[in-house]
């Protein structure tokens, strides 16, 4: 047994070590949370850009597909005579200098011999010598060609199906380039008008940017390939248009999320777990959206200012402040559901359910910067349940 003084000193030492570990643990958890938020912000930003790019690509793909379908229908009517003509030629005309794709026979198991050397009469006074590497390379090529039976028919001519595929691909590519050139010439004056309108565009509210971007996309939707056509216009303000689209997309997502939260209604038929998970999921999405916007604000704010794009909506006095305030509705629904469960099931009063409700309320309180009168009243009602149980 140690004296009481030594016991007290050991106890104090252990308490201090425990406190130090707790502080360190809190610090690590905070850093981990910040890293998760940063990763979520980057993923959201990438997702925003990908979604907008996919929308534009799908629109262009539909137009390309419709134009290709029309060209393939016309091309198929013209390709049959070509293939017949090529087959006929292959049977009537024989080239004295055989090629692997014309001289091959289906029954041959060995590659054909190399072409004979020309006679000395044709050589004149020039001196020549045999080159073994030419023979080896020729035999290697002919051996490889002999294994391509699926592409060569019995007469040694490429099959009509293979011909059609090759011709179809060439025609499609040629038509695509032709359509780009045609769009460049046809819409030249209209695109010059769009350039002047984009360069002169100024906005006082972010909702005006949404409308303007929608109009620009509609005006450019008739182009077979927007990027390919606009490359022919050096004065096209690409950076400003991209910034406008980015701002509209970054504003649209949190705005829609805020509307979803304001219209949220708890379904009494849902179980307690389902109801609380729905509310928690909305709050997680809300925090992620707000954090992403706040972190993006410093990097994009200056660029938006340069292009006269409204950026004040990213401040607490704008949309971000409205989103934080909308989280109070989630706190109200969460606490109401907890209180209802506690009142109907007394056994849960001393469990973790009350702590769960208070913890969520505290999280919203810190996120929104406080409670309004209605939310505070619901909190007091929840608090009374605990007080009543303690007195009982």
Swiss-Prot record:
It is found in: Cytoplasm, Cytoskeleton. Keywords: Coiled coil, Cytoplasm, Cytoskeleton. One of its GO terms (molecular function) is microtubule binding. The keyword Nuclease does not apply. Residues 65-128 are annotated as: Disordered. GO terms for cellular component: chloroplast envelope; cortical microtubule. Residues 11-52, 269-299 form a coiled coil. This is INCREASED PETAL GROWTH ANISOTROPY 1-like protein 1. It comes from Arabidopsis thaliana (Mouse-ear cress). The lineage of its organism: Eukaryota, Viridiplantae, Streptophyta, Embryophyta, Tracheophyta. The gene is IPGAL1.
